[in-house]
Amino acid sequence: MAYRKRGARREANVNNNDRMQEKDVEKQDQNSKTQLSDKVLSKKEEIITDNQEEVKIADEVKKSTKEESKQLLEVLKTKEEHQKEIQYEILQKTIPTFEPKESILKKLEDIKPEQAKKQTKLFRIFEPRQLPIYRANGEKELRNRWYWKLKKDTLPDGDYDVREYFLNLYDQVLTEMPDYLLLKDMAVENKNSRDAGKVVDSETASICDAIFQDEETEGAVRRFIAEMRQRVQADRNVVNYPSILHPIDYAFNEYFLQHQLVEPLNNDIIFNYIPERIRNDVNYILNMDRNLPSTARYIRPNLLQDRLNLHDNFESLWDTITTSNYILARSVVPDLKELVSTEAQIQKMSQDLQLEALTIQSETQFLTGINSQAANDCFKTLIAAMLSQRTMSLDFVTTNYMSLISGMWLLTVVPNDMFIRESLVACQLAIVNTIVYPAFGMQRMHYRNGDPQTPFQIAEQQIQNFQVANWLHFVNNNQFRQVVIDGVLNQVLNDNIRNGHVINQLMEALMQLSRQQFPTMPVDYKRSIQRGILLLSNRLGQLVDLTRLLAYNYETLMACITMNMQHVQTLTTEKLQLTSVTSLCMLIGNATVIPSPQTLFHYYNVNVNFHSNYNERINDAVAIITAANRLNLYQKKMKAIVEDFLKRLHIFDVARVPDDQMYRLRDRLRLLPVEVRRLDIFNLILMNMDQIERASDKIAQGVIIAYRDMQLERDEMYGYVNIARNLDGFQQINLEELMRTGDYAQITNMLLNNQPVALVGALPFITDSSVISLIAKLDATVFAQIVKLRKVDTLKPILYKINSDSNDFYLVANYDWVPTSTTKVYKQVPQQFDFRNSMHMLTSNLTFTVYSDLLAFVSADTVEPINAVAFDNMRIMNEL
């Protein structure tokens, strides 16, 4: 029986195995059926073969296609990333980029008052030069004559180019125009003086020397030079120096002397120069320990406001200015001292959170990123951003409730305008949906992008709780007050923030939230938020102190700003991590920090120097634009003038400023009036353009052309030449007009009718003293080109000289041959040097000292920081 039973068991086992195999076969059949149905329905094309190798190849092909598709995906991804990078680069190009922050700071600090304009020489365009005199037969006489010539003769040919030369000359005068002239500093000894007298500068001395040694100088002039010396009137602090100047140069220097920018300096001026709020701040003790002499002088800084309104429609330029101001402000915000130990604070926080007992992930996040460096960085960022009116963006993690609760303090203290709208909305929405609405069991807020109201404004209308709604109302209406102090527009914080009372309002709202039931949320969620609120509320006193400290440092440094604080959202933003705000709230100690007097003075000086330089460069640009228009420089690119203006401000990357802003800047500059000094200087140049042209050896003022040969005439300055000294009796045609219209018919008709014609305009004045080359060039260069090709712009009139210096002088001696030319160069006579008319007495102060750093005379100290008081006469930090 037993045997039989064993066999039966075996059979049963075999049967079971068969069944299992059958099941497997069925499964395989089903799989194959599904695979077949898939293959039939799928649109993929497959080749069915019996050959195993081909099947392997097909698998490999599949693998390779997969790899190719992967590679293609990667390529597409990189292409997308590349496109994003390109888009970002395009965006960056519309925003001027900056060099490292240190270099901007150095550029700003290196802008000094214009001490470089202190002159050691008088301004001169002309210098006297000796030229030989020629007799009637063309021979050079032994005696010479003095004429006024240009010191730097770079006059180009062509009327338009000459006018451009005068614009460049004007620009040069503007850069060299001294703020003050002290003749004693440049006076030198007159070598020919009997009693060691002095003349005004080294060039006057060298001119006197040359005239004294000239054999033809009259005895009376020599005696006069021997008498030339300074005349001092000590009781009036005045000295007169003799000078030898061309009348135009004299007009310039006399104007500079009469319109100096220096003003008398005394203790009152220095004390009033210090910003009023710092003078009246009881925390700063200012003292002057000496009186200034009566000869002390200073240059009043030019602090006009908002002449170009760069905040209005100049996004890139405004971004650059605010960035440089931000970097400067960060460098002067004091570092926090005696912060709470990070380890000790984290340990205390973890005890408060009971993290040993509870290991809730969200609560361990509360402690991440807390460190003293982040706290200090946050303090500096907040104050510097408000001082420079830089827009901030917030970076946060929604699950970190602690950073959101810290964000509630931040939004209470800092006005809404300081944050980029999208970032502000995101942060407010996170606070509403994570803390405020769950506390009252309200449904999540579904915020539509583009809604004119912020999440807090919507929440204020929906929440019934008075304390929470009251706090939301304060945040929604937290704006800067615009106040003009000492003529500067300041962005002032709300009084409730300045005295710290608003923190009590925030705490009342937080306590109300922590008492709520969070009905729709789990218990752990409610506990997490309650503990986060508890952590912040435990530091109520420190938060009040921190708010007062922030406001005091902001307002004290704000007193040193000289340009209007215009509030406009900036293109780029300063990033602020909410974890660093948590660090600041949790680690702030009880040590007061206030800016040192030296830091304040430095900040004030840098701001004054930049602002003054900004206004002076505006004046220069406006003057150059006006001059270009009055000189009819129709081809002058105004953009180049604007680029120069921006370069001279030092902080701009000019190549990256968009063109639309360049042209808008040009239009704004055109509307401004020209400063009086610069206008007077331009009028001086404009009135004397003719005299300056005459003194040039490079250009003539026109050319007379004719069919018939015109005889060469004797000229005192050159001998036998084809020069005409006047245009009487000739019909005149303006060369520039002729070249612009291109109508040469009038000239050719006149020439064909045997009438000489005078082409008036700035032409090259080239000397060619060889008679042979004169004859060779005559018809080929001048006459043929005018009549046949009708091209006036290629006309190169030549000054032909035939005199005793010439190797071919024997041709002149041969009276059978009369030298002639078909052109006559029209050249005006330069002004002759007359010693009596060129001797001028210049008057200036005998002595004075110009002080550039006025605050160097003020010794300043502060009270002990612990005793420093805020505007309400209460200590800044009360929590000890």
Swiss-Prot record:
<feature type="compositionally biased region" description="Basic and acidic residues">
    <location>
        <begin position="19"/>
        <end position="30"/>
    </location>
</feature>
<keyword id="KW-0677">Repeat</keyword>
<feature type="region of interest" description="Disordered">
    <location>
        <begin position="1"/>
        <end position="43"/>
    </location>
</feature>
<feature type="site" description="Interaction with the intermediate capsid protein VP6">
    <location>
        <position position="841"/>
    </location>
</feature>
<feature type="site" description="Interaction with the intermediate capsid protein VP6">
    <location>
        <position position="228"/>
    </location>
</feature>
<keyword id="KW-0167">Capsid protein</keyword>
<comment type="similarity">
    <text>Belongs to the rotavirus VP2 family.</text>
</comment>
<protein>
    <recommendedName>
        <fullName>Inner capsid protein VP2</fullName>
    </recommendedName>
</protein>
<dbReference type="GO" id="GO:0039625">
    <property type="term" value="C:viral inner capsid"/>
</dbReference>
<feature type="site" description="Interaction with the intermediate capsid protein VP6">
    <location>
        <position position="220"/>
    </location>
</feature>
<keyword id="KW-0694">RNA-binding</keyword>
<feature type="region of interest" description="Hydrophobic">
    <location>
        <begin position="394"/>
        <end position="414"/>
    </location>
</feature>
<keyword id="KW-1153">Inner capsid protein</keyword>
<dbReference type="Pfam" id="PF05087">
    <property type="entry name" value="Rota_VP2"/>
</dbReference>
<keyword id="KW-0832">Ubl conjugation</keyword>
<dbReference type="GO" id="GO:0039616">
    <property type="term" value="C:T=2 icosahedral viral capsid"/>
</dbReference>
<feature type="region of interest" description="5-fold hub; involved in the encapsidation of VP1 and VP3">
    <location>
        <begin position="1"/>
        <end position="80"/>
    </location>
</feature>
<dbReference type="InterPro" id="IPR007779">
    <property type="entry name" value="Rotavirus_VP2"/>
</dbReference>
<dbReference type="GO" id="GO:0019013">
    <property type="term" value="C:viral nucleocapsid"/>
</dbReference>
<comment type="subunit">
    <text>Homodecamer; each decamer is made up of two conformers of VP2, called VP2A and VP2B. Interacts with a VP1-VP3 complex. Interacts with the intermediate capsid protein VP6. Interacts with NSP5. Interacts (via N-terminus) with NSP2.</text>
</comment>
<feature type="site" description="Interaction with the intermediate capsid protein VP6">
    <location>
        <position position="839"/>
    </location>
</feature>
<comment type="function">
    <text>Inner capsid protein that self-assembles to form an icosahedral capsid with a T=2 symmetry, which consists of 120 copies of VP2, with channels at each of its five-fold vertices. This capsid constitutes the innermost concentric layer of the viral mature particle. It encapsidates the polymerase VP1, the capping enzyme VP3 and the genomic dsRNA, thereby defining the core.</text>
</comment>
<dbReference type="GO" id="GO:0003723">
    <property type="term" value="F:RNA binding"/>
</dbReference>
<feature type="region of interest" description="Hydrophobic">
    <location>
        <begin position="422"/>
        <end position="442"/>
    </location>
</feature>
<keyword id="KW-1141">T=2 icosahedral capsid protein</keyword>
<feature type="site" description="Interaction with the intermediate capsid protein VP6">
    <location>
        <position position="224"/>
    </location>
</feature>
<keyword id="KW-0946">Virion</keyword>
